[in-house]
């Protein structure tokens, strides 16, 4: 069965989810809802990408139809998601990627239009969160609206899981050095309660809050209350990096930790989600990398055998978007 997908919102994640879907023969995007672009502009935005480069296939506007690699994708232009008739084009699994409808109630309106399941491409206020390689096996088919968590949680959770299963995590702090996102400002401007967030993304390293570390406790209950963290937003268009500093229950040399992470990256269970490198890499080396988390063996350090700093990279756009597709395909099989 080819999973029939609809995408609500054709922004950064929406467009990259479409790109990711084209690399997975188990799914096909049948429809996109985008009320703020006409088809010609959608073609342009999909064809040219300042970060990931020009789309290597074909994308056309043919008589008002959005056509990618010869396949027509129906375009809706509904501002109210409750009015999208997904069933009219056979789209059953919906990606909610507007960033606006983050609760079970708000994202659940897609079900009125014929959707069977909805995956929110962001942390949700109340929907169950799943991270591939971590807790997807706990998914229950009764859950119609779920969340793919955040890009940072997708990087951190697999790393934390493997370390905890092998050495035990007593407690830890995470910092993500995070690329800029669309919510930030190019020049200084007003920003409500978070004044620092209103400063220019192009000129500053901006400390910010993140719920990514605490969210690990939701997908890995054994670590609930043991992790917290923060973010530094940096002037970088894509690719972020997690710095996880943990106190271990079981003594381990850094070489032993490296061996465990390398083995995980080569295992059938984790190799799609976890990468491993001993190269002298920098952030641009990971643009387009579809792993959730790439362990940097040469970047981490140990103070002693119980206290270590671990470093793992992630393409916060392409890696995350690929996981959205993986989650959709996974739940379709469970259903």
Swiss-Prot record:
Q: Upper taxonomic classification of the species?
A: Eukaryota, Amoebozoa, Evosea, Eumycetozoa, Dictyostelia
Source organism's superkingdom?
Eukaryota
Assembly and partners? Homotetramer.
PANTHER family xrefs = GLYCERALDEHYDE 3-PHOSPHATE DEHYDROGENASE, GLYCERALDEHYDE-3-PHOSPHATE DEHYDROGENASE-RELATED
Positions bound to NAD(+) = 12-13, 34, 79, 316
Q: What's any GO biological process attached to this entry? A: glycolytic process
Give the family per the record.
Belongs to the glyceraldehyde-3-phosphate dehydrogenase family.
Q: What broad class of enzyme is this? A: oxidoreductase
Q: What is this protein called?
A: Glyceraldehyde-3-phosphate dehydrogenase
């Amino acid at each position: 069965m080819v999973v029939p997908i609809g995408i609500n919102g054709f922004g950064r994640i929406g467009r990259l989810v479409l790109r990711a879907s084209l690399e997975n023969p188990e799914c096909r995007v049948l429809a996109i809802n985008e009320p703020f672009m006409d088809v010609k502009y959608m073609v342009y935005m999909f064809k040219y990408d300042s970060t990931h480069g020009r789309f290597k296939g074909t994308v056309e506007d043919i008589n008002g139809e959005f056509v990618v690699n010869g396949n027509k994708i129906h375009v809706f232009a509904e501002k109210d998601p409750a009015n999208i008739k997904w069933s009219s084009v056979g789209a059953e699994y919906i990606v909610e990627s507007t960033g606006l409808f983050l609760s079970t109630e708000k994202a659940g309106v897609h079900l009125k239009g014929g959707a069977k399941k909805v995956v929110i491409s962001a942390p949700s206020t109340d929907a169950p969160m799943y991270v591939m390689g971590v807790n997807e096996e706990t998914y229950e088919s009764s859950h119609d609206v779920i969340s793919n968590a955040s890009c940072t949680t997708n990087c951190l959770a697999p790393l934390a899981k493997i370390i905890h299963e092998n050495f035990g995590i007593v407690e830890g702090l995470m910092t993500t050095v995070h690329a800029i996102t669309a919510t930030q400002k190019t020049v200084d401007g007003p920003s409500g309660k978070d004044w620092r967030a209103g400063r220019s993304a192009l000129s500053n390293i901006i400390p910010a809050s993140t719920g990514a570390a605490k969210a690990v406790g939701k997908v890995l209950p054994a670590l609930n209350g043991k992790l917290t963290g923060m973010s530094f937003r940096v002037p970088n268009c894509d690719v972020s990096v997690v710095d996880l500093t943990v106190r271990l229950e079981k003594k381990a040399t850094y070489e032993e930790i490296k061996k465990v992470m390398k083995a995980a990256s080569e295992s059938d269970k984790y190799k799609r989600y976890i990468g491993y490198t001993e190269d002298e890499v920098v952030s641009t080396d990971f643009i387009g990398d579809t792993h959730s988390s790439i362990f940097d063996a040469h970047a981490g350090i140990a103070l002693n055998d119980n206290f270590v700093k671990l470093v793992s990279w992630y393409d916060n756009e392409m890696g995350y978007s690929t996981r959205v597709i993986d989650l959709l395909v996974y739940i379709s099989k469970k259903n």
